[in-house]
Amino acid sequence: MLKKCLFPAAGYGTRFLPATKSMPKEMMPVVNKPLIEYGVEEALQAGMSDICIVTGRGKRSLEDHFDVNYELEHQISGTNKENLLSDIRNVMGQCTFSYTRQHEMKGLGHAVLTGQTIIGDQPFGVVLADDLCITLNGPGVLAQMAQLYKQFRCSIVAVQEVPANEVHKYGVIAGQYISDDLIRIEDMVEKPTKKDAPSNLAIIGRYILTPDIFDLIHDTQPGKGGEIQITDALMAQTRRGCVMAYKFKGERFDCGNIDGFIEATNYCYNNFYASSSEKTVNRSWYR
């Protein structure tokens, strides 16, 4: 059963400087909620209540966010502002949080490997918080993938079609279609050129991984820039067995860049806040 979810969150967030000079990019607020909280809510909806966050230097606010602030609680006690904390209280009440540090930035594969001691020998989810996924009707993206895992018991990556001139930003897959939205992966290339891309199906920041991925990452040689890519380990897993790609239902916003972040903010405001005249109302999307 899927209970654990890993959040790689040690990166510098340089595309959002100077804001991220003193604030983790995962704490950037979309309307009034930080990106990391949206991701944890999505994991919780999928049944993953054991949250492991891979942090780094200057990321202490991630830990503080999922903790009680007694001074603040006392200050707003008995006022209508108490309701503004209802979502985070619910998350804190249902999740356990563990933290481990990634001392060197060596790619997503290395970040996942850093969480091995906490994850252990269990299948687990991975959420990249700067990929904000919203599903207005029905289960969230990770919950959709968790249902598929019950059937296939293998690693699964979320994918979406991207323009051909953007494939160089992503890991790109190709394979055999099992259904309209499910592909058995046969090829996978990290950040290919337009010419070399096997398709326009790009991996986004949602994964379900089986625990044998750790040994495969450990055996993966660093590539460009000394980074260990998760796609290399997944391709090795494909050769040994099966890895699925899933074309998810819902909206995805790349909040790792300013345009995507603004689009996400407008979307969330219009769908969760604009219809309410009282902005202190609870607007958790994931229930």
Regions found by a protein language model. Give the residues of each.
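Conserved beta-loop-beta/alpha segment of the NTase-like Rossmann-fold superfamily
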Residues: 64, 72-75, 82-172, 209, ...
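Short, active-site-adjacent cap segments at secondary-structure transitions
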Residues: 59-61, 132-134, 252-254
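N-terminal glycine-rich phosphate-binding loop and ensuing alpha1 helix
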Residues: 2-81, 138-140
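Catalytic-core segments of class I nucleotidyltransferases/pyrophosphorylases
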Residues: 125, 138-142, 146-150, 177-254, ...
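Well-ordered alpha-helical segments embedded in enzymatic catalytic cores
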Residues: 35-38, 110-114, 233
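Residues at the starts of beta-strands that form the adenosine-phosphate
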Residues: 4, 49-51, 123, 154-155, ...
